[in-house]
Regions:
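An N-terminal assembly and electron-transfer interface module characteristic of large anaerobic redox
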Residues: 1-489
Length: 489
């Protein structure tokens, strides 16, 4: 399915990728149904909590160095700015940059502006963002309130762009448009593809776009690519508008996360002919093998890739074998976004750990290049099937499963789910950094981190003795998926 570059907005994942938030079964069943078009979403008649696509769009764009955000909504819609500023400063710290806050203005829509329109507040917010931050571009993130009342954000953006002479770009990411918060990433990338990225002035055969979040693995990636005669261009966070505008000049695009990079990578390929490397994520041994080999094919560096793989795997072999011995027989549950979840199930297997259940916060039945996610296909091709479920961060389902299965370990990418198994006495590891388990060195570091969590579990043990969980015994006797409704026919 091609991306509609001419549209002002990105189609949500439910309509574009047939994404779902409700499922229980096995990975083989999931992939088989996705491939033949019979996979249906199962709604919940009870939902405890979720997230908002606006936060993903706003958070991702707010880390562009010389851009500003105008969030057109009620003041509460900017509550994410606390976490966004924390994340921004973490990234600045690992780069030894001066610490700054995110450059964001909220239009503070009130009852009056919701009833009579918020256009004047939006104009005021754009002018104030320009005056206060002197940005090279301003992104307007929308909210449920501004969308419901029909404020013409594009018309106001065009009007103010003429006035202040920099790009003023609508990012249509209001929360009610999608139940899948990753749709917010697509909204952000759509704004960049349609308004910021420019046609290439020249092609750079050594330049590789690297789509990521925080970028803590920059030195390792630079080292890897230098062995292949390539140079990474990291994006989108901590890039400038000028750097992003020239991403069409690269020889290829790679991503640390399929869920994140699919829209932008496929969009660059569709619009500018920059090949997007479509493969499993570069976590663990097989992930990095596949990632590098597909990159090598895209840029004609197959021999250099094979030479590097042989050398890198030889260096870690003794340590990896030792780690596997220590982790043999351990059982884990994984709960992450879909691309990370299905990749980390494989990574844990490479470390000698048996994954007894996998949870993903949603599932894309195909990516923008038309294929079922490569990580899911790879997992389904294994001899042993794995029970999995799809839930958009519903902790009541996660805790029910943990209570029944009682794994040795829980691995997640979000603190909101990692804290609960810790309170149940289960050792937990939060994969906050996207470069955890990245490549050959990363899997070694990840293995040691898991060993440490298993051997030093006194915090979880003591918490479990003192904390009463917010669910009564009745719930833990129920099927974890009691509130999943039947498939829509």
């Amino acid at each position: 399915m091609s991306i509609n570059i001419k549209s002002i907005e990105a189609a949500n994942r439910e309509s574009r990728l047939n994404s779902i938030t409700g499922y229980t079964g096995t990975v083989k069943d999931l992939v088989k149904k996705a491939q033949c078009g019979t996979l249906k979403n199962r709604e919940r008649c009870f939902s405890q909590a979720s997230n908002c696509s606006s936060g993903c769009a706003q958070g991702y764009l707010s880390s562009i160095v010389d851009a500003a955000i105008v969030n057109h909504g009620a003041i509460g819609c900017s509550a994410d700015v606390i976490g966004e500023t924390t994340g921004l400063k973490w990234g600045q710290n690992i780069r030894d940059w001066e610490k700054t806050n995110v450059k964001l203005i909220n239009t503070n829509m009130t009852e009056n502006s919701t009833v009579f329109g918020g256009k004047n507040k939006l104009r005021e917010g754009i002018r104030e963002a320009y005056r206060r931050f002197n940005p090279k571009a301003i992104f307007i993130t929308t909210s449920c309130a501004s969308a419901i009342i029909g404020d013409d954000v594009k018309a106001i953006a065009d009007e103010l762009e003429e006035e202040i002479k920099i790009p003023v770009v609508p990012v249509l990411c209001e929360g009610f448009r999608s139940k899948i918060w990753a749709s917010g990433f697509d909204s952000a990338f759509h704004a960049l593809l349609t308004r910021i990225v420019k046609s290439p002035r020249k092609k750079c055969p050594e330049l590789i776009n690297m789509i990521q979040f925080s970028g803590s693995g920059r030195k390792y990636i630079t080292e890897i690519l230098s062995n292949l005669g390539l140079v990474p261009q990291f994006g989108i966070p901590y890039s400038t508008i000028e750097q992003i505008s020239r991403m069409s000049e690269a020889a290829a695009t790679i991503s640390v996360c399929g869920t994140l990079g699919s829209y932008f990578g496929n969009g660059l390929e569709q619009k500018y002919g920059v090949p997007y490397v479509k493969t499993i994520q570069p976590h663990g041994i097989k992930g990095m093998d596949s990632w590098l080999r597909e990159l090598g094919k895209a840029v004609g560096k197959e021999k250099e890739v094979e030479d590097y793989i042989v050398k890198a795997k030889k260096e870690i072999k003794p340590e990896l074998e030792d780690i596997r011995k220590k982790l043999k027989g351990k059982k884990a549950i994984v709960g992450m976004g879909p691309s990370f979840s299905h990749n980390y199930i494989r990574v844990l297997k490479e470390l000698g750990i048996e994954v007894v259940w996998g949870i993903s916060w949603h599932f894309d039945q195909h990516y923008d290049h038309g294929s079922v996610p490569e990580s899911s296909i790879a997992l389904s091709n294994r001899d042993k099937d794995i029970p999995i479920s799809v839930c958009d961060g519903q902790n009541f389902e996660v805790l029910n499963l943990l209570n029944k299965i009682k794994p040795d370990l829980y691995i997640s990418r979000h603190p909101g789910t990692t804290v609960w198994p810790t309170k149940m006495g289960i050792p937990s590891v939060m994969v906050a950094d996207e470069y955890t388990a990245f490549g050959y060195r990363g899997i070694i570091n990840f293995g040691y981190r898991i060993i440490d969590a298993l051997e030093n579990n006194s915090l979880a043990e003591e918490l479990s003795k003192r904390i009463k969980l917010p669910y009564n015994p009745w719930w833990f006797k129920q099927d974890a998926f009691k509130f999943l409704e039947d498939e829509v026919k």
